[in-house]
Amino acid sequence: MNHTSDTALLIVNLGTPEAPTAAAVRRYLGEFLSDRRVVSIPPLFWKPLLHMVILPIRGPRSASKYAKVWLQEGSPLSVYTRRIAEGLTQHLPDWRVAWAMRYGAPALTKALDALQAQQVRRIVILPLYPQYSTTTTASVQDVVEAWCKRTPQVQVECIQDYAEDPAWVAAVAASIRRHWQAHGRSEKLMFSFHGLPQRVANNGDPYPQRCQVSASLIAAALNLNESEWVLGYQSRFGTERWLQPYAEPTLWALAESGIRRFDLVCPGFSVDCLETLEEVALGFSETLAARGATMRYIPCLNDDPAHVQALAGLAQRALL
């Protein structure tokens, strides 16, 4: 199919504060935690708790964490997402390529409006969540579907996920191999994925199965046996039970069993962000060091050329 400028690819990531300040973080978290896909507590109870308790506490606390990982160009998540979009223009020369965030800026709806204003007739939406979840991908789809209802003349295709896409799996495996070639192999590799409440999975969210599929395929590409890798879930929020095993306590238990050297990669994150750089690369490393063990963080694919090429392939196949 010969794609011209009436075809566009819109990559969508989660979002980020515009600055590592308490005010900016509060604005961002206020939008993020108001999404019923993310927090399903009835608004009558949740909104007062969010605005009177959670945001005043988490705003300053999270701002200090963002400051630790903020780049000169801006938020890592924003910087790398933009670089991916720039790279995609090289692989898709006959497409328009844009990027947006589900929360914060550049806003998803505004990005869609801008593409329509450029006379785009077909848009492929690619949420940068390798593993589908109702809490992430479906939230993007909600916004896109609402926009499509008032813009029926534009054909929109939304990619569900790419948890087992061969090119993506190969790119992740290659990044791990490069790390091993440069630094040597550890005793255990952990695949750490963002967690979500267990009740969400109990209600039918396929996310844990998609994470398991991704981890198993990457491990197979690396010729690892089951004793050489482990899966865990990070970034738990609140007091309810989340997906298990929890990543950090699992590492602690393994360290106490005698394992002293770990590598950790986060295949559920397309680009590095607060959760990978501050929580994992800094936080997990510190707590393991206190237990006499070391952990080396393997960065996300970010704007790795193999990652960009894999995403371009997903977009092209979406219109076949």
Swiss-Prot record:
<dbReference type="GO" id="GO:0005737">
    <property type="term" value="C:cytoplasm"/>
</dbReference>
<comment type="function">
    <text>Catalyzes the ferrous insertion into protoporphyrin IX.</text>
</comment>
<dbReference type="InterPro" id="IPR019772">
    <property type="entry name" value="Ferrochelatase_AS"/>
</dbReference>
<feature type="binding site">
    <location>
        <position position="194"/>
    </location>
    <ligand>
        <name>Fe cation</name>
    </ligand>
</feature>
<dbReference type="GO" id="GO:0046872">
    <property type="term" value="F:metal ion binding"/>
</dbReference>
<feature type="binding site">
    <location>
        <position position="275"/>
    </location>
    <ligand>
        <name>Fe cation</name>
    </ligand>
</feature>
<keyword id="KW-0963">Cytoplasm</keyword>
<keyword id="KW-0350">Heme biosynthesis</keyword>
<dbReference type="GO" id="GO:0006783">
    <property type="term" value="P:heme biosynthetic process"/>
</dbReference>
<keyword id="KW-0627">Porphyrin biosynthesis</keyword>
<keyword id="KW-0479">Metal-binding</keyword>
<dbReference type="GO" id="GO:0004325">
    <property type="term" value="F:ferrochelatase activity"/>
</dbReference>
<dbReference type="InterPro" id="IPR033644">
    <property type="entry name" value="Ferrochelatase_C"/>
</dbReference>
<comment type="pathway">
    <text>Porphyrin-containing compound metabolism; protoheme biosynthesis; protoheme from protoporphyrin-IX: step 1/1.</text>
</comment>
<keyword id="KW-0408">Iron</keyword>
<dbReference type="Pfam" id="PF00762">
    <property type="entry name" value="Ferrochelatase"/>
</dbReference>
<keyword id="KW-0456">Lyase</keyword>
<comment type="similarity">
    <text>Belongs to the ferrochelatase family.</text>
</comment>
<dbReference type="InterPro" id="IPR033659">
    <property type="entry name" value="Ferrochelatase_N"/>
</dbReference>
<protein>
    <recommendedName>
        <fullName>Ferrochelatase</fullName>
        <ecNumber>4.98.1.1</ecNumber>
    </recommendedName>
</protein>
<dbReference type="InterPro" id="IPR001015">
    <property type="entry name" value="Ferrochelatase"/>
</dbReference>
